[in-house]
Each structure stands twice: as C-alpha cells, then as structure tokens.
Amino acid sequence: MNNLIKSKLELLPTSPGCYIHKDKNGTIIYVGKAKNLRNRVRSYFRGSHDTKTEALVSEIVDFEFIVTESNIEALLLEINLIKENKPKYNIMLKDDKSYPFIKITNERYPRLIITRQVKKDGSLYFGPYPDVGAANEIKRLLDRIFPFRKCTNPPSKVCFYYHIGQCMAHTICKKDEAYFKSMAQEVSDFLKGQDDKIIDDLKSKMAVAAQSMEFERAAEYRDLIQAIGTLRTKQRVMAKDLQNRDVFGYYVDKGWMCVQVFFVRQGKLIERDVNLFPYFNDPDEDFLTYVGQFYQEKSHLVPNEVLIPQDIDEEAVKALVDSKILKPQRGEKKQLVNLAIKNARVSLEQKFNLLEKSVEKTQGAIENLGRLLQIPTPVRIESFDNSNIMGTSPVSAMVVFVNGKPSKKDYRKYKIKTVVGPDDYASMREVIRRRYGRVQREALTPPDLIVIDGGQGQVNIAKQVIQEELGLDIPIAGLQKNDKHQTHELLFGDPLEVVDLSRNSQEFFLLQRIQDEVHRFAITFHRQLRSKNSFSSQLDGIDGLGPKRKQNLMRHFKSLTKIKEASVDEIVEVGVPRVVAEAVQRKLNPQGEALSQVAEERVDYQTEGNHNEP
C-alpha cells in the first residue's frame, strides 16, 4: 500500500457510494459499491485475502470514490460505470451472447422469420429459444400449418413455397389483410401454448380427407398432429399459470459465484443462461450487479415476472427491472427458484471437479516426466528456440512453464548480437550463455529442466555452456521434430538417447505444448523484428527523418504499407515537418501512386513477457 492510498483511506466517508480502483497506468480495473465506503474500501488493504482478491489488490495504486444518496443509487451507478469502463476484474456479460426469437412481422402481409435482434417495431416476438436449431424446428412446423408470405415477388409471380402449399401467394390470392392478421393471431396463440384449437382443426381436416379417400393429405395432417405432440413433450410445463417469467438462482463457493437464469415462457422452461465468475463483494451485492447487467442486454426481453431468491433485496431488483419482482415462499414458483439454485450449485461443483482433474493431469505429467528422466519433478521448465531466415534478423526466445502451465510474465526475447549469418549452434551458445550467466550473476532461481527445441547438436552446445563454462547442474533435454515439423522425439542423458515416451501420454502432450509455444513466440518476435528492420531501411536517407521520428511513425502507423497509404497531412499529424512528410511520400511512392486513407484495425505489437535479456 503506497502513501497515496494511505492518505486517501483517511478521507473516506461512511456514506453509500461507488469506489473505483486503478492500476499504475491509471486504468480502471475494478468498480464496486458499498453501503459504507470507509469500511468497504479499507477492507481491501487490511487482513488476508484469497488468491483472486490478492491479485486485484496487488495492482491497485490509486482509487477514487463517488458518494450517492442511497444503496440503490450506488447499485445503478456501479452498473453504468462497469458498462462504460469494462474493468477487467468485474463481472462482464458477453456482448455477443444473443438468443434467437420467432418474429411475426408487422407488415400488411405478415411473415414468419427467425431473428436475434428484438426491436420496438410493432412486430410480435416469441422466445428466446435455446439455439437457432430449436427455433427453426418450430418455424418449420408452423410453415407447414400456416402458409405465410415467404417472398417479395411482384404481383404476377408466385414463389416455390406456393407450389408446396406453404405460401398463399399474397400477390394473386383473393385473401384480404384481415385473413392474414387472423392467421398471425393463431400463430401467436400457438406460440403461447394455446394449441388445442389448432390440433382440433387438424383432426377435423384429417377426418374429412380420410372420408374423401385423400389418404396422403390425411397422413400429412396426422404427421402435423404428431409433430405438435413431440414439441409439447420437449417443452415441459413448469408452471400451470402459463406465464412468462425469468427465474434466478445463485450459489457461491471458494470465492466463485454461479448464476443461473431459467427462461420460462408460457409456463414452459425453454432455456437457461449460466454464468460463473469470481466475486469480490458480498455475494448478494454482486448478484444484484449481475441482474442489472443482464437486463441491459438487448437480447434479454423483460418478462411479466422475475423470481429471485429469498436473501436478495427486492426493492433493489425493482430499481433494475421494470417487471413484477417476487420472492416466492411456497408452491411452483418456490420450486422453480430452488431448481435454479440447485443447478447453480451443480454447475459450480462441476467447474471445480474439472479444474481438479486438469490440475491432476498436469501435475501427474510433470511428476511422470521427472520419474522418466530420473530427475526431481520439473516444476519450472525453460525452453529455447531460434528463428531466422537466411541469417537475417536472427533471434531466440525463451518460454517458461511453471507447474505445467505457461508463465508468460517470465518469457524472454533475445536479439542475436555476436553471430553473423545462419549459424544455429552459435546462436544457441550465445543465448544460453546470456540467460544462465545472468541467472548465476544475480542468483536467480534456476529451472528444474531446460528443453531445447532442436536435436543433438543444439543440446550438446547448451550442455557445454551450462555444465562446462558456468558449472551449473541443470538437466537439459532436446525435442526433435519430424519432417512434418511435428514433435517427434525426446532426447536426454549422457550420452544423449531417445527417451521411450508414449505419444498418447500426458507427458508427451505437455512437451508438445511447450515446443509449440516456444516456436510460436520465437517466430512472432522474428517477424516483428524483420518488419521493423524493413521499415527502417526503406526510410533511410531521408533528410530530417531521424531515429526518433521513424520510431514515432512506426508506433502510429504500425506498418510501412499504412505509411504509403497515408496522406501528407496524416504524416504531419504524427509530428513530422511537412517538407519531410512530402519527402517520405516521394520515396515510398516514386511512381506518384494515388494516396488513399484506409481505415483498418491497428495491429498490436505488444506480446507476452515483452522483455529482452541483456
């Protein structure tokens, strides 16, 4: 805790409000609300916390607060601040999570369509459905029963659906608008669960067709009746009153929360929404934040009723949702809430079970690898790979895996300094010497295992430096690839031998992940460096364009192509004098090519562990 935070903690009021945590860059990383700002904010910097809260606190270098008149006002402000700033430690619902709806359009001749966008356009919307497949299944059934308009053909034409009996051909039929509006109402009744009348009509038509010896048509009506029955079976009735409601339940354990929302439409449970996330406040307060965000999503229509658990502030939810809010005490509605809570508990337990299994697999892999190589369990593994093209821009990279998982903050990148031309062995010698010379000088913790992406030659070079030059006792292994550039063999021992390692084992998969990751990291760094060198060389020799201005151009435009496409005015905006900007354009566009402004997404050249070793 720095002096700034200590000073601000003394100034905190006991009022309700919101607090805003910031990191060293001034970025908002967490927004919270409190009934008592002083007690809540001070709690972050006193006593011990679980791992996730410690991670948050370790990044806080400043905070602000906003006093509100009430707890509910603080809740509403918190939701808006989260939506505006998207802090990384807050609950964030996925923006792209939308469900399909069946829509009866508000047109002269209505259409039946599937949509994910709900608009206030006078149309009727039914849903949400669990996925587009479920929505299409219902729509296909409705298309067979109700011949709505399917196309926008001119008055003299009919569409394909007319010929198969699924369109009335509104352009030529004698039916008026009232007929189609009546049909739309029947569909609406059907989607609301009132399908008895439709089944009775189909049964009557089936009987008439059978009496008229039209057995194929009678069979079609029979199939439609059976399809409706199947649909009824899939959509279990959860409440006899056939209301539309959302049912919320939540469960907390080990610092995590799971919220489940049941979508009950016309008394039938048609879908659920599941979200798991770490929580930092009291569970009931973070639950309220979740509810507020939930109904900000356009795809979440507000139903007639919202059911919530007993421990939630009913008035706070009413401030968030314009609907009837209930905390049921007994009966069907209470059972629905209990079911949502039970499912939240099961989902959270499954998460922890899967996590434990994943940890067991990874831990088992590194333990088995240690036994296989007859070394202590390699908790920390450092791996190296070189990258160059015909000796140009040679680089090397190191990735680190701790407990079988990437530790990206420990990744390192190396520009090769002493090697001329494509000499992979010499490059490996330089990098190993630089890395472990530093480990030795600064008394850094050495790895339990070094893995070289290469064969016998590269491994022997690493051994010479580590064991003979530096006198360090660190096991070194090599990973050879086959002609398809896939992980093939593990080399280890003195002399080096191929280790008998099953390709289906967790140990092999771990080594494969390490080799793929170090190769990716090295080649990404090489491409960046090559691009930068190409950029600089083409801008050499321009009067008034020194290293600093080149760097500014690179930072702003990200690529030489975008500088070529930029106008002189755009280059001037970066801080380059106009006469120099004109010289840049003359050199990059010697043929006087037309310049155009291209709006493209900027490339982010920041990568993991963006550190260069000395």
Swiss-Prot record:
Taking every annotated instance into account, which residue ranges of this chain make up the domain UVR?
A: 196-231
Task: Spell out the GO cellular component terms annotated for this protein, sorted alphabetically and separated by semicolons.
Answer: cytoplasm; excinuclease repair complex
Q: Where is the GIY-YIG domain?
A: 14-91
Q: Where is the composition biased (Basic and acidic residues)?
A: 599-614
Where does it live in the cell? Cytoplasm
Q: Matching InterPro entries, A to Z? A: GIY-YIG_endonuc (IPR000305), GIY-YIG_endonuc_sf (IPR035901), GIY-YIG_UvrC_Cho (IPR047296), RuvA_2-like (IPR010994), UVR_dom (IPR001943), UVR_dom_sf (IPR036876), UvrABC_protein_C (IPR050066), UvrC (IPR004791)
Q: Does the keyword Ribonucleoprotein apply?
A: no
Under the heading PANTHER family, the entry gives: UVRABC SYSTEM PROTEIN C, UVRC/OXIDOREDUCTASE
Q: Which NCBIfam families does the entry link to?
A: uvrC (TIGR00194)
> What is this protein's name?
UvrABC system protein C
